[in-house]
């Protein structure tokens, strides 16, 4: 009996482990795993269905087919456990050992493992230092390889063809040894002395100068060092014994009709065994060499196919001509082991059904059909039936439930009470896609869902289905209740704003009841309180929209959160007075004393959350919903065709536009404008006309004339149903109404370009055939786009999750002093994002100081909550240094202070929160709303490009930035000669209000320090040409300005004036390739001018295309224009927008023609040009020259003698993020990526908090490249995890040795995911074969730190309560005896309900 109990104990005990290691198995190891050799290719006997002995399913090797029963039937039952039957040789045990016992095949000739041969870069090739082609020739018997040269002049590893070999054999006899096939390669590997190779490589690396050689050597060194560290012998890459998978994992199932369904692996193994046995026989028979060779080659190919079919040559096919699924195919790809079975399991205790709306539910409830609940909660009901003694056995209980006896329903109610269930709607794009609810039993078969959570699930009721899951254990129930209950998830984790916001009908109802109407019934009445007002409304004495006076009780909270009641008389509308009844205590009436549109309601809920806490807000949201539905019903909104009012002015607007277009057409025919200009102008005209019609239409829809009580005619906001729906934000938008009642406007072709004939009709008038046809273009493109977009967006999310999945908050504070300086985001003089929005919920990194009194207002380490931010704003502080995930110094994970507030909860983030995954979801979830296309600059965009002046938008004082340089010309105008100068405008307290870039050659209209009013012009310039301006006065002397060589004379047809234009050097004769036309300046004595204080000559070079405006010998003053460059040369670049742009940024791709940034701070000069390239030299402060070769077409923004800062752009073009990191550092890179990503999302109106993007940038920066290894034994140029280097450096410093010096390096998200420390995570992401091959050779150890690895091995994830569990487990493993009270340290913070919201 004891034995039996032990058996059960052993089944439930789970393995505890801290890491998983992967390596190469030696032949002896493989034999030790095996329970016997598979000698025959037979599987099972087709008549008896019993496995054949020594075959692929042999019971003697793999174990019995039935539990505790040997094959011949001599021993049956449990009492013979462990006996080995002497007749059939089968051990009597459980049949499930057939899932774990392996066999093996002794190969007659060694075989190379294809992964180490063909998975690039070829590991075999790297170890042997031979090319893949050569090794393949040896392996597949096309050539010999010299293994031992002996005393001959041959080299080890040299290849010989058959003839060579025979010739050498005659020449040297058996002095040398050469082999072919895997034996040859095995001997080479066996004779490799790893230790001495490593030493020689180390010395070679220190000697070598060339980069390519260094790369090659360090790669090889890395592999050999991996062998050394992990104790793996290189010859194990060649298989001598092949393991055989347990038979239950490659099943053979008899179908009816005598056929068998089998796993492809059986076919592949059969081929290997057949060829192996044939080879053995040939060797015994001493067959001719050529036949044996052929058989060996076939064996090699058979093993290749088994391991990775199709990797080399044609894939082996089965009877039905499809390629067989090999071992490698089993684990890789979407339907492989990792993604299909380990990361995506099916779950029991779950069901799915269609959803319908549940407007009577409370926020934390969902309606669950009784039938479904009965099935889901079966075990709980069985338990109750037994406990209450209503059923004696489970079997009896089962019968009662199946017969649906009345008592069962009562018990179901009892079981379900307080037992939350989880609802999930696919696709689950963010964590709010699964939420917990308390079930309410309902009749019918559909699940009822609360309307307010639809936004989070992105659910609607047009046939959507949802899945229900039951959390079983008490811990699971507790977590579902405290963390996942819908009423605990009011805020969106992406931006911290409420996600439980009324929409559609509810908004319409609330909007309708808070609107006011002139001269409504009951206008001017007075009410003692709201109840009296309600009576008047119920008795139809007063309308909802009437202006009335009501006494309203207002409850506010003072500083100590005590309730203060005040009663005041307000003049308001009856509807708003009714609405005031449901306000939570703490919100003043002023919040609802206006027409409530969707935005206002969102603000209302936000304010309620911040002031009154979570509980009150949830109750309030529910009440809002009930009220909204009630009054939407009362309103009885309806729309008719007549509601779509077509504006009277439409005809004349269209007429004017047509006239303008005719005018442009005639200009075009007479050759005044080009085809491109004509197209742009026409599109522009129609765009403006469409806007004008829309404006007229909204004006007409939005107002109506009525008579007031005095009999005067007044205009009030319209009660037109269509207008109200759009205005309230319930449904529809101005753009859609414009198509119904205005004009449809311009349409796009499928390639994204705009068709220049607009659709002037609208849907109310109806479209003619041509118009309808043009419309269909856009609609179809939209559908095609959506399909593509979903896939792309999903893939982006997957990559983001993969790169951040191991980032968890692991400690409270890392103690770093670093942070990010944040100021308001200003673009083109307009504040795009205010400072408060950017710092809210962060932790201050340094003290915040009052700019006027210089005293500390908030100390470093303060969480910047709403109140703090309000104070900061009031004090006029315009930049704050905050903690950021980028500079967090926690080794593995993040600290709570660097992350700041948990946006979905409203207080400082808990230890154990998986912030990486949340960041990935927040960025990926709106992905489907982004556009897919690249925009062509055309129409409206080109109009914006031709700006010619800067205007101030606010009052204040002008400040020039340090980069601004200017000269005063003869007309006493200030002319800017810097390219990166900016004008700031600061208010009285010195805060920056706006900033503007000033282009080169602009005339500055204001001086530094001047006080200006809003609307003042700051600078003007000619938008069509770019000047070349002299900074010095003197007499012009041309050099290399030769007509027909470097310049061409152009005569204007109309005016007859001639100008000199610098021509492209491509058209010059070869002798003048290196000359560039330039100007030297002479002083009065005729000497060449030098730049003040230096020996450098003033020399101004003309660019290609410049029109020279001065004559040789002319005197010029400072600030005069020497030449103009027409602006038409600037090509319009396509802007990559939407999803592709976000992916491009996160993948850290270098743009095509990237701009060049200065590597050092120094002075610019131009060197001698080469063919097609110009040479730019920057001489740094120590006098070292740095050269750049730049193609002639590129526009160099720096000019001769200019002093540039390190990281400043000197050649125009898009920036390469890698350059920003290298030259300007991590902060600049982070702000670049953040701003660029935010631009894309902002365009679509999506709000995402910056910190999510920073979290991802942190993960992109997690590797460093070793610059100087010190005493660490790392290799220069090697990429290592930052945490690993820090660890090694700590050890070095402790030992008093030299630590390594390293530089940060930026990896794209795919690269970063694949290069993570965890090989399990990387293998389950992409390129499984490559990752596993590399890991096996290096003998890698996976510490199971991330979430994904732990899910794959089936443990709790190290986040949330799982973090506490793992910490405890590790401490116990370390032998610490822990008190129960300390068990939960470092785990969850108490539930949201017991926490006051900050």
UniProtKB/Swiss-Prot annotation:
Enzyme class label: transferase
A molecular function (GO) term: zinc ion binding
Cofactor annotation: Mg(2+); Zn(2+)
Residue numbers binding Zn(2+) 2: 814, 888, 895, 898
Binding site for Mg(2+): 460, 462, 464
Subunit details: The RNAP catalytic core consists of 2 alpha, 1 beta, 1 beta' and 1 omega subunit. When a sigma factor is associated with the core the holoenzyme is formed, which can initiate transcription.
Protein name: DNA-directed RNA polymerase subunit beta'
